[in-house]
C-alpha cells in the first residue's frame, strides 16, 4: 500500500490482447507481392465483410484513426514535436483513401519520424541525467498527458525530458536517502553519504533503467512491430475487441487459451543484450534438470541435428526464443553463463509445459460441521486442437465430482478477474448445473438468432451454488453468471456490475485468404462477428451482469468496464428464449436479504470501499511535486492515510481450507511445488471476506431445502 505513490514513472508501449473463440467463414483469395499492402488488403476486406457492425471508412473514420494512431505511437508526448503533428495532418482526412488502395505512405512517414525522434530521445535522457538535479527548486511534473501539448522546439523537448528524468530519479533519491538515514539510526558510528553522493547514485540508477528500457524494449522493436501498432489501430476503430494478431502474438494467444506450450519451461528476459532466466516453471525440463537457475544467462543455443551452436547475445528476445523453444521430445543444448561466471553446457529434452495458474482448482472448507467446496476458474480455457481433452468445463466437472465424493453441501464458483475465453466451454459448463436448456443466445448481423443449448440431460451439481464476480469478470464469465441468474440457479455476489462485454470474437487465420502467398505468415484477426444475449433477452453489453448481492471492491471507483470504452457497441435486447426457472426449493429472496444485511454492517467491506475511494483519489492526482521536501511531505501523508487500510490484509475468517483428497495423494509423489502453491491459495482464501460471505449464503440456502439427486428444468 505504501508503495503506491513511490513507483517510478515508466513509459511502455503496450498492446493488450484479449482472447475468444476460433473459426473462419469465407473463401475469397487475394494476391499481392508486398506483405504489408497484402495485409491491409485482406484485413480491410475481412472487416467490411465479417464484422458485426462494420463502419464506413470515410473522412470521419480517417480523422479518428489519425488521432488514435498518433496517441498510440507517443502516448506521453515525449517524442513528437508540434511540427511533426502538423506534417502528419496532411494525411488526416485521406488515410481512408490510402487504405482503399492498400497504400501505406502514412505509416511509412510516421515510422521514419518516430525512429528519428527515438534516437534523439536517447541523447536527451542521457544529457538530462548527466547533470545534478536541484530538489530545492519548486516545480511540478504533469502526468495528465491528454492535457499536455506537444512541444514546439528542441529546448522544450529537452526540458520535458529533464523533468521526466527528475521525476523518475526523485523516488530513487528518496529510497537511498531513507536507507542512509536508517543505517545511521541503527549505528551511530555510521557515516552517511553526502546529499551529492546520494543524488549521483539516484541518477545512475535511473540511467541504468533507461538504458535497459531503450536497449531491451525499444531497440528490439522491428518494423513489423510498429506496423502491428498501425494495423491494430485501424481494426480497433471498429470496436474495442477486434484486434490483429501478428504471428508471434497469435502464438502467445494460443498459449494463453490452452495454458500450455512446448519448450524448456523457463521465463526469459533480455537485459542489455543478454538473455537471462527469470523463472523456472515447476515441473518443466529446465526445472527438472537441476542445472539451471534464475539469473543464469543463455549465450548460445544448439539444436540436436546441428554441428555448431548459435550465438544469441544481442539477438532480439523474440528471435532468441524461437531457437530455444521446440517440439516435445527434441533436444536443445544451451551454453550457460552461471552467476559465478562459469560457463557450462546444459542439454534439455523439450516437453509440454503447463501453466497451472491457467487451470481450475478446488478447495474444501468445513463451516459449522458442514462441508463446502470452492472452485477457482481463471479463464474459460481450451486446447483448440483437442477440445474434448482440455477445456475448462471438463476440468470443473472433474473437480465437482471429487468434491461431491467428500460430501460437500454447497459450492462456490469464483469467476473474479476471469476475462472470458471459449464460448463452447462456457455452454458446456453451464450444463453442469442444469438438466438441459438454453444457455446463451447469439446473433450475427442480418441473421436469425441462434440459441446455444445444453443438450446433456445429466447434472453434475444440483445443490446450492454461489458465483463470485467483479468488474473484471467478462465475456464467457458473464454468460455463465447471467445464465445461472436467469435460471435462478445461483446467487451472484460481487461488484455492482460485471465488465459488460457482450460481443463474440472469432479468430480468423488470414493466411487462408491468400492464394499462392510467398510473403510469409500474415497472422490472424480476432474479429467481432456476433453479439450474445441472456436467455431472458437482454444483452450484457455495457451493462454487464448485476450482482444479487452487491459488495465493494478494489475496482469500484475505477473506470475499467466496457462502458468506459469510446467505441463500444451499443446495448440492445432481443426476444427471450424458451426456458423455465430452476425448481424453486431454494429461498433465494431470504438468502439475498440476509446477505445484504450482513454486508451493510461488515467492517472489512466498509474499509475496502474506503480504500477503493482513496486509491481513486490518488489516481486522479496528476501533478507531482519535484521539490524534495514537498514530495517527502506528500509521501508521508499518503503513508499515514494508508496505515488505516493495513488491517485489510490482516483480516482472518477463522476458516480452514484444504485440498481435496485426490490432490493430497498427489502431494506425496509430486515433483513440482503444487503443495506449496495450494497452501498459498488456501491462505488467501482464509483471508477473503467475499468467499466468507459466499459460504454464509450457501449455509442459508442449505437450511431451506433437502438436496435432491436430480433437479429438473422444464422447457
Regions found by a protein language model. Give the residues of each.
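Cleft-lining beta-strand/loop regions that shape enzyme active-site pockets
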Residues: 25, 31-32, 48-57, 219-224, ...
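Polar, glycine-rich mid-to-C-terminal structural blocks
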Residues: 476, 488, 493-560
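PDZ/PDZ-like domain segments forming the peptide/carboxylate-binding groove
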Residues: 71-72, 93, 107, 112-123, ...
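Bacterial N-terminal signal peptides
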Residues: 13-22
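Extended, domain-scale alpha-helical bundle/helix-rich regions
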Residues: 120-263
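Charged, amphipathic alpha-helical regulatory modules used
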Residues: 27-136
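Bacterial N-terminal signal peptides that target proteins for export
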Residues: 3-13
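Conserved functional hotspot residues or short segments at active or partner-binding sites
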Residues: 147, 151, 159, 167, ...
Amino acid at each position: 500500500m505504501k508503495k503506491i505513490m513511490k513507483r517510478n514513472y515508466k513509459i511502455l508501449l503496450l498492446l493488450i490482447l484479449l482472447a475468444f473463440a476460433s473459426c473462419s467463414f469465407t473463401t475469397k483469395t487475394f494476391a499481392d507481392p508486398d506483405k504489408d499492402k497484402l495485409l491491409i488488403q485482406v484485413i480491410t476486406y475481412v472487416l467490411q465483410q465479417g464484422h458485426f457492425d462494420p463502419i464506413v471508412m470515410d473522412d470521419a473514420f480517417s480523422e479518428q484513426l489519425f488521432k488514435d494512431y498518433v496517441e498510440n505511437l507517443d502516448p506521453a508526448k515525449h517524442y513528437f514535436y508540434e511540427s511533426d503533428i502538423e506534417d502528419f495532418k496532411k494525411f488526416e482526412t485521406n488515410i481512408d483513401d490510402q487504405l482503399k488502395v492498400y497504400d501505406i505512405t502514412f505509416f511509412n512517414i510516421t515510422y521514419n519520424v518516430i525512429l528519428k525522434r527515438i534516437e534523439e530521445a536517447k541523447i536527451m535522457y542521457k544529457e538530462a541525467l548527466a547533470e545534478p538535479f536541484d530538489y530545492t527548486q519548486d516545480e511540478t511534473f504533469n502526468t495528465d498527458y491528454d492535457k499536455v501539448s506537444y512541444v514546439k522546439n528542441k529546448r522544450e523537448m529537452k526540458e520535458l525530458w529533464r523533468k521526466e528524468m527528475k521525476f523518475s530519479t526523485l523516488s530513487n533519491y528518496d529510497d537511498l536517502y531513507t536507507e542512509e538515514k536508517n543505517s545511521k539510526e541503527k549505528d551511530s558510528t555510521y557515516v552517511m553519504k553526502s546529499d551529492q553522493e546520494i543524488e549521483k547514485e539516484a541518477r545512475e540508477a535511473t540511467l541504468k533503467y533507461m538504458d535497459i528500457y531503450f536497449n531491451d524494449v525499444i531497440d528490439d522493436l522491428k518494423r513489423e512491430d510498429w506496423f502491428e501498432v498501425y494495423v491494430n489501430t485501424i481494426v480497433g476503430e471498429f470496436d474495442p475487441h477486434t484486434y490483429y494478431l501478428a504471428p508471434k502474438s497469435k502464438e502467445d494467444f494460443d498459449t494463453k487459451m490452452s495454458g500450455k506450450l512446448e519448450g524448456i519451461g523457463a521465463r526469459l528476459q533480455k537485459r542489455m543484450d543478454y538473455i537471462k532466466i527469470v523463472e523456472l516453471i515447476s515441473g518443466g525440463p529446465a526445472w527438472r534438470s537441476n542445472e539451471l537457475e534464475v539469473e543464469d544467462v543463455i549465450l548460445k543455443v544448439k539444436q540436436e541435428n546441428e554441428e555448431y551452436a548459435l550465438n544469441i547475445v544481442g539477438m532480439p528476445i523474440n528471435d532468441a526464443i524461437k531457437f530455444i523453444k521446440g517440439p516435445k521430445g527434441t533436444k536443445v543444448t544451451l551454453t550457460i553463463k552461471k552467476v559465478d561466471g562459469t560457463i557450462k553446457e546444459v542439454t534439455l529434452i523439450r516437453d509440454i509445459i503447463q501453466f497451472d495458474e491457467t487451470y481450475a482448482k478446488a478447495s474444501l472448507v468445513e463451516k459449522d460441521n458442514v462441508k463446502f467446496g470452492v472452485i477457482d476458474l481463471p479463464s474459460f480455457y481450451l486446447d483448440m486442437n483437442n477440445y474434448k481433452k482440455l477445456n475448462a468445463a471438463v476440468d470443473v466437472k472433474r473437480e465437482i465430482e471429487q468434491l461431491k465424493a467428500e460430501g460437500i453441501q454447497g459450492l462456490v464458483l469464483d469467476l473474479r478477474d476471469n476475462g472470458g475465453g471459449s464460448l463452447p466451454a462456457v455452454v458446456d459448463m453451464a450444463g453442469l448445473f442444469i438438466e438441459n436448456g438454453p444457455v446463451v443466445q447469439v446473433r450475427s448481423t442480418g441473421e436469425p438468432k441462434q440459441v446455444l443449448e445444453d443438450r446433456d440431460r445429466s447434472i453434475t451439481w444440483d445443490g446450492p451454488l454461489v458465483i463470485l464476480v467483479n468488474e473484471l469478470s467478462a465475456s464467457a464469465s458473464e454468460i455463465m453468471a447471467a445464465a445461472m441468474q436467469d435460471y435462478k440457479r445461483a446467487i451472484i455476489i460481487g461488484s455492482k456490475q460485471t465488465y459488460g462485454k457482450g460481443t463474440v470474437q472469432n479468430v480468423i487465420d488470414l493466411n487462408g485468404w491468400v492464394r499462392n502467398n510467398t510473403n510469409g505468415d500474415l497472422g490472424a484477426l480476432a474479429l467481432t462477428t456476433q453479439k450474445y444475449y441472456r436467455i431472458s433477452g437482454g444483452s450484457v453489453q455495457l451493462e454487464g451482469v448485476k450482482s444479487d448481492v452487491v459488495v465493494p471492491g478494489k475496482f469500484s471507483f475505477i473506470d475499467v468496464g466496457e462502458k468506459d470504452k469510446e467505441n463500444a457497441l451499443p446495448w440492445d435486447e432481443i426476444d427471450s428464449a424458451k426456458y423455465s426457472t430452476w425448481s424453486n426449493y431454494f429461498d433465494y429472496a431470504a438468502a439475498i436479504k440476509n446477505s445484504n444485511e450482513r454486508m451493510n454492517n461488515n467492517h472489512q467491506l466498509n474499509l475496502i470501499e474506503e480504500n477503493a475511494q482513496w486509491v481513486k483519489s490518488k489516481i486522479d492526482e496528476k501533478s507531482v511535486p519535484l521539490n524534495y521536501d514537498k514530495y517527502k511531505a506528500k509521501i508521508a501523508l499518503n503513508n499515514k492515510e494508508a496505515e488505516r487500510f493495513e488491517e485489510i490484509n490482516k483480516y482472518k475468517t477463522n476458516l480452514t481450507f484444504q485440498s481435496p483428497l485426490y490432490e493430497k495423494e498427489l502431494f506425496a509423489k509430486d515433483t513440482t511445488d503444487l503443495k506449496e502453491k495450494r497452501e498459498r491459495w488456501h491462505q488467501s482464501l482464509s483471508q477473503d471476506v467475499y468467499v466468507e460471505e459466499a459460504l454464509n449464503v450457501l449455509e442459508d440456502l442449505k437450511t431451506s431445502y433437502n438436496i435432491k439427486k436430480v433437479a429438473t428444468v422444464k422447457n
